[in-house]
Amino acid sequence: MTKFLPIRKTHPILKIINGSLIDLPSPSNISMWWNFGSLLALCLMIQILTGLFLTMYYTANIELAFFSVNYICRNVNYGWLIRTIHANGASFFFICIYLHIGRGIYYESFNLKYTWFIGVIILFMLMATAFMGYVLPWGQMSFWGATVITNLLSAIPYLGTMLVNWIWGGFAVDNATLTRFYTFHFLLPFIILMLTMIHLLFLHQTGSNNPLGLNSNMDKIPFHPYFTYKDLIGFLILMMLLLMLTLSNPYLLGDPDNFIPANPLVTPIHIQPEWYFLFAYAILRSIPNKLGGVIALVMSILILIILPLTFLKKIQGLQFYPINQFMFWIFVMMVILLTWIGARPVEAPYIITGQLLTILYFLYFILNPLISIYWDKLLFNK
């Protein structure tokens, strides 16, 4: 019987691809919000490929790193393009992953627990990779960003100082630090690639969620051609936006201080990370205690893990809970405002604003399940 089947269904390797991309049973009603998974895969591919070409010319040495990046931009064929695509590609990666997580929170896809937990691990890995990548050009913001962020580990009782010196490979951010950051920046995307495959493996065990939050087993359609073409439109839009930014204003999202070679003797006026970390940075700064700030920083991402545990509703998805919907969009606004606060100097109106926003950010995760219980009582009169 098998000899009458197409090769994609019988070949050991093609069978895996077929089950993931061609004959995968998909809910017929998934919207544009389900496109971001494939867009993230595209971003990862772009980053790995551009990174591979950059690494051929980059030199991980504090004397040469800044000038090797300069050399790439000035003398390597299309080096400026590869570098700016890589830098802006990271921004698009984070835009896509934040929208992907937002979709997961809104439609409560976190009930696919293993998929969600692996996703949170991928987010941590991505943040670590992006942070280490930011250090590599060895400009002022690279150096001071590395110094400030790694220094946060010194807040850990007993082990802190020893841990920081161990990561630095000395008593300050130096050549050893740059070399190891470069090593891990090269290695982590491949670990992210492996985790993505595990993420998909768990997702395909259960099947995707859908905008109604209902069991869609009775109404599935094959992934190809329906969603391959739908994803292709997303690819075209993403590539268009990425190239528009890269070719018209490539350094818009960067920091002007990073055009100055790293100087340990001169501190920039305002040390800040890239825009995609600013909300977490604002949360870190709003706690007046060092250890407390570090815990708040980690918890701002790690809190996503508690979402499946606080699911106490009778219906899946916020689309049936108007008050929760309203709260969700307030929460989105909080994250945007925290991003803005993170870029502002530490002075009068911004400090208290950041602290209030931090309280409201964490309050969402407490109030959301409580309000959903209240709404269930109204709906079901129990």
Swiss-Prot record:
Coiled-coil segments: none
- Quick one: which residues bind heme b b566? H100, H199
The record lists a ubiquinone as bound by: H204
Q: Which PROSITE patterns match?
A: CYTB_CTER, CYTB_NTER
- Which of UniProt's keywords are assigned here? Electron transport, Heme, Iron, Membrane, Metal-binding, Mitochondrion, Mitochondrion inner membrane, Respiratory chain, Transmembrane, Transmembrane helix, Transport, Ubiquinone
Which GO molecular-function terms appear in the entry?
A: metal ion binding; ubiquinol-cytochrome-c reductase activity
What is the recorded membrane topology of this protein?
Multi-pass membrane protein
Q: Quick one: where is this thing mainly located?
A: mitochondrion
What Pfam families does its record include? Cytochrom_B_C (PF00032), Cytochrome_B (PF00033)
PANTHER family the UniProt entry points to = CYTOCHROME B
What more the UniProt record tells us is: Heme 1 (or BL or b562) is low-potential and absorbs at about 562 nm, and heme 2 (or BH or b566) is high-potential and absorbs at about 566 nm.
Q: What is the role of the protein in this entry? A: Component of the ubiquinol-cytochrome c reductase complex (complex III or cytochrome b-c1 complex) that is part of the mitochondrial respiratory chain. The b-c1 complex mediates electron transfer from ubiquinol to cytochrome c. Contributes to the generation of a proton gradient across the mitochondrial membrane that is then used for ATP synthesis.
How does the annotation summarize its subunit structure?
The main subunits of complex b-c1 are: cytochrome b, cytochrome c1 and the Rieske protein.
What protein is this chain from? Cytochrome b
